[in-house]
């Protein structure tokens, strides 16, 4: 159990990284798991929410992502910028794979789904997000869906506070986190989980833990270290907690921007007052040229999550190596459930 494992706690992630330790188990209800992400992390969140809807059984959130399986049957750039990628074959694949290569699509009718786009996003714009909404509309319950557009926002993670080094809402550059006067993390979590306690806007009670993304918890294109935010209420194991997975976008991994995605997106503020652990898996730049879906070749120098088939033809299906690693992390964390 968690409190019997020696771990290295980081009060704040600084320039010096504490050596990663084994990923502990926590008293987390396995029926309280969700995921969200930005950009390639948004694509990955949709992949996990669809392919592993039995694991991410509360719901998922997508910030500036696109349709599930989008890049398999059209070149990946069709799924970017602000075009209208075809969802005909991807949606047909969801139906034909249901219950085999992916979990049953019937699950999606029971999941809470949150989607966000910036009206001025030219990297993965509103038209692409609209196609995701249309695709999921074949399976979801519209009463369970929230779709939000922030006027003037670009390709960024939206917050309502000024984190150190963050941008204005109209600026799409590193660290791709911006004060848009919109609490994206809070909006996603409140939609997915329902009513929550007010966030902690002061000093947080919890700590950040680094863990080894190795063995079944790691994969091609993933860094050797991942992170968890654990509120004080979840640390001892006395309280049953929930789990949310927060996925960074391209150029947002720890190797690119340090701890900013972990500290500045606002997830931890909500987790701290709601008995919620936040898991931050980490991708890493990969300069090797790989074959991708649809016959192309591409390297991954921006440390994106795999939404184009870099690491296998089954990248968005059960057993896709990055998804399997993240699911392995989730299953280890919830294995300490005492209910």
From Swiss-Prot:
It catalyses: [(3R)-hydroxybutanoate](n) + H2O = [(3R)-hydroxybutanoate](n-1) + (R)-3-hydroxybutanoate + H(+). (3R)-hydroxybutanoate trimer binds at residue 307. Disulfide bonds join 70-79, 169-180, 234-241, 250-304. It comes from the Eukaryota. GO terms for molecular function: carboxylic ester hydrolase activity; serine-type peptidase activity. The active site is at residues 39, 121, 155. Residues 1-20 form the signal peptide. Its main location: secreted. The keyword Disulfide bond applies. Pfam families: Peptidase_S9. Optimum pH is 6.0. Keywords: Disulfide bond, Glycoprotein, Hydrolase, Lipid degradation, Lipid metabolism, Secreted, Serine esterase, Signal. SUPFAM superfamilies: alpha/beta-Hydrolases. The enzyme is completely inhibited by dithiothreitol (DTT) and diisopropylfluorophosphate (DFP), and partially inhibited by HgCl(2) and by enzyme3-(p-nitrophenoxy)propane (EPNP). Activity is not affected by N-ethylmaleimide (NEM) or phenylmethylsulfonyl fluoride (PMSF). Glycans are attached at residue 144. PANTHER family: POLYHYDROXYBUTYRATE DEPOLYMERASE, TOL-PAL SYSTEM PROTEIN TOLB. Esterase involved in the hydrolysis of polyhydroxybutyrate, a microbial polyester that can be produced from renewable resources. Belongs to the carbohydrate esterase 1 (CE1) family. This is Polyhydroxybutyrate depolymerase. It comes from Talaromyces funiculosus (Fruitlet core rot fungus).
């Amino acid at each position: 159990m968690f409190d019997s494992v020696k771990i290295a706690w980081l009060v704040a992630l600084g320039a010096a990284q504490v050596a990663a330790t084994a990923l502990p188990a926590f008293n987390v209800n396995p029926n309280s798991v969700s995921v969200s992400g930005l950009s390639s992390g948004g694509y990955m969140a949709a992949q996990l929410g669809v392919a592993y809807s039995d694991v991410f059984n509360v719901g998922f959130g997508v910030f500036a992502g696109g349709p599930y399986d989008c890049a398999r049957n059209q070149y990946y750039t069709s799924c970017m910028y602000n075009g209208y990628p075809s969802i005909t074959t991807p949606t047909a694949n969801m139906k034909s794979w249901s219950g085999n290569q992916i979990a049953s699509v019937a699950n999606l009718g029971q999941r809470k789904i949150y989607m966000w786009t910036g009206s001025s996003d030219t990297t993965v714009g509103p038209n692409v997000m609209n196609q995701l909404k249309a695709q999921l509309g074949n399976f979801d319950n519209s009463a369970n869906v929230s779709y939000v557009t922030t006027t003037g926002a670009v390709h960024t993670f939206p917050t309502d506070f000024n984190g150190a080094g963050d941008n204005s809402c109209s600026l799409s550059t590193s660290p791709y986190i911006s004060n848009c006067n919109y609490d994206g993390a809070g909006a996603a979590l409140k939609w997915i989980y329902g009513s929550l306690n007010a966030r902690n806007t002061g000093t947080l009670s919890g700590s950040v833990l680094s863990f080894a993304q190795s063995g079944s918890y790691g994969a091609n294109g993933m860094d050797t270290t991942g992170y968890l935010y654990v509120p004080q209420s979840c640390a001892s194991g006395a309280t049953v907690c929930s789990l949310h997975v927060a996925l960074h976008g391209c150029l947002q991994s720890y190797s690119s921007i340090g701890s900013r995605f972990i500290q500045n997106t606002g997830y931890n503020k909500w987790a701290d007052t709601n008995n919620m652990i936040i898991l931050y898996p980490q991708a890493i730049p990969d300069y090797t040229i790989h074959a991708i879906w649809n016959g192309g070749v591409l390297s991954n120098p921006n440390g994106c999550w795999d939404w184009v088939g870099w690491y296998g033809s089954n990248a968005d299906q059960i057993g896709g190596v990055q998804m399997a690693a993240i699911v392995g992390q989730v299953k280890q964390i919830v294995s300490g459930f005492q209910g």
